[in-house]
Swiss-Prot record:
One cellular-component annotation, GO: COP9 signalosome
Record's subcellular location: Cytoplasm; Nucleus
Positions of the MPN domain: 38-171
Lineage start: Eukaryota, Metazoa, Chordata, Craniata, Vertebrata
Protein name: COP9 signalosome complex subunit 6
UniProt cross-references to SMART domains, sorted A to Z: JAB_MPN
Organism domain of life: Eukaryota
InterPro entries to which the protein is assigned, alphabetical: EIF3F/CSN6-like_C (IPR024969), JAMM/MPN+_dom (IPR000555), MPN (IPR037518), MPN_CSN6 (IPR033859)
Function: Component of the COP9 signalosome complex (CSN), a complex involved in various cellular and developmental processes. The CSN complex is an essential regulator of the ubiquitin (Ubl) conjugation pathway by mediating the deneddylation of the cullin subunits of SCF-type E3 ligase complexes, leading to decrease the Ubl ligase activity of SCF-type complexes such as SCF, CSA or DDB2. The complex is also involved in phosphorylation of p53/TP53, c-jun/JUN, IkappaBalpha/NFKBIA, ITPK1 and IRF8, possibly via its association with CK2 and PKD kinases.
Entry keywords, A to Z: Cytoplasm, Nucleus, Signalosome
Glycosyltransferase keyword on record: no
Pfam families cross-referenced by the UniProt entry: JAB, MitMem_reg
Major location (coarse): cytoplasm
Disulfide bonds: none
Amino acid sequence: MAAAAAAGANGSGGSSGMEVDAAVPSVMASGVTGSVSVALHPLVILNISDHWIRMRSQEGRPMQVIGALIGKQEGRNIEVMNSFELLSHTVEEKIIIDKEYYYTKEEQFKQVFKELEFLGWYTTGGPPDPSDIHVHKQVCEIIESPLFLKLNPMTKHTDLPVSVFESVIDIINGEATMLFAELTYTLATEEAERIGVDHVARMTATGSGENSTVAEHLIAQHSAIKMLHSRVKLILEYVKASEAGEVPFNHEILREAYALCHCLPVLSTDKFKTDFYDQCNDVGLMAYLGTITKTCNTMNQFVNKFNVLYDRQGIGRRMRGLFF
């Protein structure tokens, strides 16, 4: 209302103000300060980027991805430490989260990271829109006051394209409406994360940066295998052309190809068979020992339950004997 009044008073300058107001997303709350302090780990950003890149490679076009945020919360301090992907379906142009998949993944993460809890969800794209509100309401059915993180992988800015929001309820036109309030966040890193981020930073897209020893070794191996493949393919094409009579026989080249084939390791020797069978027996024995251990554990649980049941029945008999 105040913006409209200012627009009417200022004439042409007011129309400019109305355009600015129209550009503000309708799902954003204005004049609201964050109620929590957020510390974001680089691992979360790397996970989201990897998730988006894999989906873009599989689909051949940029895709919106959705996942869960996990970490720790102490009072008003929230530390987002990790994330995992979520399954979603589109029904009538609305995104529906697969909650059964979420509960399965949550149980798996609880077995490994018992101290971490579900904090919210993430997605990719531009500024928040009503579709994000729709998904956020579904997440609110799982936990109260979840965080919402949005990463824009298509931005051209040099700043980190990550925004964190919390939901607030505002009265608009007499109705309670859910809106997003942006939160400020800080980056928190551990030693392992610093090493990983430094390694990724060195691996630039142009290759002009300093590469790690492992990366250089893998690149050299890839180049050598690629060269070997092209040379073997050339020899094979020459042999086929010679057999078909398309090119004259060159006995020197054929002898060299024959000698090259005999340089390959022979896998039909007795020593290879002995080592191969020994390794197979070792693997089979390890699997067998694992099965025996699991069976013993099951039997132990059965015996414990049987003993508990037997003790209860014995106590019941003694108690009945006392009454008689």
